Design a protein with these regions (language model features):
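Soluble, acidic/polar mature domains that operate outside membranes
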Residues: 1-324
């Protein structure tokens, strides 16, 4: 009888321990994925007119124009590929795993202290969505936390491997539109290409509505040209991008005092002028044969490969000797 009572007591104790362990696990690991904290995606991206990206040392404020391009406060255009990725993140973001409840506080504090805050606003400056992103210690995964929420989540982006929050840590110059030349043939009114060290290669191509295009040399004398060469040349003026921008005013000022390789001025039919100046890159006294600097109208220094700009900086002989 005593043995049976002891067995019952032991079973009762084990049962109580099991219940306590289960409750502890539930309290530490269970989350309601349908809760407000778990609603991490943006409901209506078409209503977004402004995006604030607040970092530890600075902030980016992006605004949408009527023509669907996005600009920064300095009026520089935002790289459209980055905007596309931002909206992809906040339309496809998924919870990869929940965080144990006993870790919420520590992780939330780290996110609020070191993470990136992204806020989406409509035209009336009302907040549509506000969320923090933060990489894990290995910089391979991403935590997400809604503004004023208690529960952080480990999140993932379908089809993307690794920590996608790195995009929001990039310096502002990396957010600039990298395309410096992009025109359709019918947009062009005038192109001037100055070969600084070989002026006899320089030319001006003038295209006025309803008139035959004119090719001029450095002395402003007209030259006959191949129409095939002209058509081919105008197709070169598309999607010409820098590799990256360098945010160094001292470098800009220094280059502006030296002799360039080329000067390119493009005037479109709306009288907008795109003036670009290209300079050699010198490393330990040697000229880089693959890349050069470019000074843009927006006061930026870019690095661009010669193979991208050489088709634009053709000599006048390209038009006069085409097919010979």
């Amino acid at each position: 009888m005593k043995m049976r009572s002891r067995k019952h007591l032991a079973l009762l104790v084990l049962g109580l321990l099991f219940i306590l362990i289960t409750i502890n696990l539930v309290n530490n690991r269970y989350t309601t994925l349908s809760s407000h904290d778990a609603q991490l995606t943006l409901n209506d991206s078409s209503a977004v007119c402004h995006i604030l990206i607040r970092r530890a040392n600075d902030s980016l404020f992006l605004s949408r124009r009527d023509n669907e391009t996005w600009i920064l406060p300095d009026q520089r255009i935002v790289n459209p590929a980055y905007l596309k990725f931002v909206f992809r993140i906040f339309s496809q973001l998924k919870i990869a795993s929940v965080v144990p409840k006993n870790q919420w506080g520590a992780i939330r504090d780290s996110i609020l202290r070191n993470g990136i805050e992204i806020a989406f606003y409509n035209q009336q400056q009302s907040i549509l969505h506000n969320i923090y992103l933060f990489p894990d210690r290995q910089n391979q995964k991403t935590f997400a936390l809604k503004k004023s929420a208690q529960e952080p989540f480990m999140v993932e982006l379908p089809g993307y491997e690794g920590n996608f929050s790195g995009l929001f840590y990039l310096p502002v110059t990396q957010w600039y539109q990298p395309v410096i030349i992009h025109y359709n043939p019918q947009q062009i009114r005038e192109i001037y290409v100055d070969h600084v060290e070989s002026p006899d290669k320089s030319f001006t191509l003038r295209i006025l509505p309803g008139q035959q295009p004119i090719l001029l040399d450095i002395e402003n004398d007209p030259h006959p040209y191949s129409e095939e060469a002209l058509k081919a040349y105008l197709t070169f003026l598309r999607n010409i991008s820098v590799e990256k921008y360098i945010d160094k005013q001292a470098l800009y000022d220094s280059l502006a005092q030296t002799n360039p390789i080329y000067r390119v001025r493009i005037v479109d039919q709306a009288d907008s002028v795109n003036q670009l100046t290209f300079y050699p890159i010198r490393i330990k006294g040697k000229i880089d044969k693959n890349f050069c600097y470019v000074l843009t109208p927006k006061g930026l220094v870019g690095i661009i490969s010669y193979y991208r700009i050489d088709p634009v900086a053709r000599p006048i002989e390209f038009f006069t000797s085409f097919g010979q």
